[in-house]
């Protein structure tokens, strides 16, 4: 269910400020988005997996909180991230 190490490293290098920047808000949102997209494919096949669906809702909520924080702190970074990830907000 989780992302591979290579996929995480690619996301960190793409969205982070450095190679080891895994804690910035942009990287956290990008990692959550990748995991959410992966789980949506899982639910197309396993419709009754309610245990994992709860985890998905938790991830969506966490991503929303991080995006709200970024919007409060720096609107320019927020809009750039939304554009890069293709989110609807």
UniProtKB/Swiss-Prot annotation:
PANTHER family: RIBOSOMAL PROTEIN S15, BACTERIAL AND ORGANELLAR, SMALL RIBOSOMAL SUBUNIT PROTEIN US15M
Protein's GO biological process: translation
Family classification: Belongs to the universal ribosomal protein uS15 family.
Pfam families cross-referenced by the UniProt entry: Ribosomal_S15
Annotated function: One of the primary rRNA binding proteins, it binds directly to 16S rRNA where it helps nucleate assembly of the platform of the 30S subunit by binding and bridging several RNA helices of the 16S rRNA.
Top-level taxonomic group: Bacteria
Any one GO molecular function term: structural constituent of ribosome
Gene Ontology CC: cytosolic small ribosomal subunit
Record keywords, A-Z: Ribonucleoprotein, Ribosomal protein, RNA-binding, rRNA-binding
The species this protein was found in: Citrobacter koseri (strain ATCC BAA-895 / CDC 4225-83 / SGSC4696)
Assembly with partners or alone: Part of the 30S ribosomal subunit. Forms a bridge to the 50S subunit in the 70S ribosome, contacting the 23S rRNA.
Matching NCBIfam families: S15_bact (TIGR00952)
SUPFAM superfamilies, alphabetized: S15/NS1 RNA-binding domain (SSF47060)
The protein's name in its UniProt record: Small ribosomal subunit protein uS15
